[in-house]
Amino acid sequence: MTCDESLYRQYLSGDDEGLNALMKKYGDPLTLYIDGYLHDVHEAEELMLDVFAYLFTKKPRIRDGGFKAYLYKAARNMALRHKSKRKPLFSLDALADEPDGRLLAEEVIRTEERNRILHFCMDEMNPDYREVLYLTYFEDMSYAQAAEVTGKTVKQITNTVYRGKESLRRLLEREGITNAQS
């Protein structure tokens, strides 16, 4: 049993500190993951709270070693449901946020600029590639955990990670980021 499962069991046995610890640990990363679907951090924060509210009220049984995958799968399902119900909005502010695409070489060297470019390229990627790369690299999930979250097989995750990395490499090269600058 991992630390997450023991904290969840602690909560199930009546100690709210277990759930508080899980919310501290996963609140921000889960919000970022949900924001990848909704592209609205405020809605993502609300949905993250809904995920934990679901755990709080339903108290589902979660198999050993599967808490993180269960949490992200629940977040994914809620985000997709929420996104399908949401009305499309057009915002003039969003147009002002568009990157100009022309970056000077000296700006690229700075970490903040490279991170901005990385996020820009990730946003342009196929959503399946983006999700699997996010889960495996940013959330440090195994391929098996990512497969459980997305409902795919481990082989499909392996292929998607490979294709996603190739796609990201091409997008980064287009923006002037190469392996030599990493």
Language-model features and meaning:
Residues 1-29, 36, 123, 170, ...:
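N-terminal module of bacterial RNA polymerase sigma factors
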Residues 11, 30, 34, 44-55, ...:
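Short, small-hydrophobic-rich alpha-helical interface motif
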Residues 12-13, 39, 49-66, 85-87:
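Sigma70-family region 2
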Residues 27, 31, 52, 126, ...:
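C-terminal flanking helix
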Residues 73-92, 111:
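Arg/Lys-rich amphipathic alpha helix in sigma70-family domain 2
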Residues 80, 144-174:
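DNA-recognition helix of helix-turn-helix
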Residues 95-123:
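Acidic, proline/glycine-rich intrinsically disordered inter-domain spacer in sigma factors
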